[in-house]
């Protein structure tokens, strides 16, 4: 609960007499205040009810509390800053106050604000942001921790180090930064999965590729993996596949999808291909990004962030009630697919260093050029958390691993004592074992035994979108171990070895070396049964047309009809 500074202390409007100071001389001020209130009633400027209400208000106790806070140097937290701005904004937009009236009402109107903050989670976030062990530089950081099912913000930290004052720069809410690869999930992948343009098993060729203006696009690791599923592209943050997915649905569709996820800082200047990889004119805030990922955790339902549940006046009347209006950013099955993929990010991809055991987790990393901005945003069945790191002046960084360390530390502590939960919605998806090089149904003994290793994956699909055809991209060859050539019918005793290759692969990618050799010559060493029985050339001596002459006095054997002693088999088969 947040108690705002409340009620105005009456004065004469012109003079400031020390003897009437409400802090040091409250009794004198109370008498003066009664005189003024009675005069206002006499003149008809206030009603009897308003006069009595003002008299009953114990404003002096609140003044003493606020003065004590000022003397002790108490400064509002980043959460309280954000809360104040939201309440003032709602007083203007919902209650119709002017901005000046809203500020006066909040700080002098006796209001009580019921906040969504969890003080223990706020303490955890502040502690971890300021833990020096995570850093090798003096980069700045922001953290947002939300309940994705209500939209309620539980904790916010808008900067690292000692907070210099109240209502100062809050990097979690106000700073717009380039989102890097975190935008892919809520941009092109969400848009393409939502519209059925791709599945998690759809395969794109991760090969040299260019923007429409001819500029080449490169992956972070500087290499190309060849045929790659959408899932693997999300897990390993592959830029080429992201841009190809972007092109599947088009710029306008992706832009509209991002608007559905609440990114309000996007402008018409952001309608460019670079948006696919997080290249924006202004950028996004941590609050926007964390809220967007919260929508995925909430089965596709977007809830705007809130810092309070209600605001009441001194009489207990509700002035503001925060009941967020939700909308469906994506279907629940689309959210389930994205969650499925981002669970793999945590298990085997770029989120491994942010993961911890004992809870279902999904998340995505993001890094811009020269690591000017580094991100990790992810969620559990309980909370969604976003961590940003970088310099206020956009300087380059040498490392960005600290955002994952902070995310893990915050989320691990936030989940202490909470029962394990799995993500809801994924149970409606249909599993199928696919070949990851073509996206079709895997063939046992073929796709799981290739020269590139096991190329099968249990993938999940919206019912009706799973593949129906079997793998068409792999071919098996059996080789003679002796000759190294394709085994023929007569290589039965020499030993054979099978190799499974790709039918084709793009040059310059990892697939190029996995394509079947062009030499399809059948074994030249074993061309007949003769070669089977005499693999080293035994029994292959040519006999002359006539047998050698016998000695003159040697008795000649009687000639048998049908027998020809010139051939070796006559020694085996007697007629």
Region spans (language model):
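Active-site SXXK
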Residues: 35, 40, 125, 151, ...
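A penicillin-recognizing enzyme superfamily signal
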Residues: 115-134, 145, 156, 163-175, ...
